[in-house]
Amino acid sequence: MSELAETTQFLAGREPWSLLPPGEAAAYARRATASYVRRGTQILTAGSPNSRMHVIRSGAVEVRDADGVLIDHDEEGHCFGQSSILEERPSRFTFTATEDTLLWSFEADVVRQL
């Protein structure tokens, strides 16, 4: 299976892409950027501007508020970063990889189209 086909299949099985008409997930998959994040790396920091939504393809990410309180632990299939884009404000949370993590990321204009 090609990387594009794998990305499309993965996205098509998750919201919001699963709500799109058939075939549209592929258009979004073409706009995804893959990145590998090492365990312990902060991906997004509370209070910082954000222009990308991230989808966890593999690995795990912890979510902490600005005071460092653990809010959530996200794994494969979870998205983060979209709320700060849609609300046009800095991130309220810090996202840190708790495992080596593969992310698929989307620019703000793609998020707004969804």
Descriptions of predicted regions:
Residues 1-114:
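Cytosolic regulatory regions built on CNB/CRP/Popeye-like sensor folds
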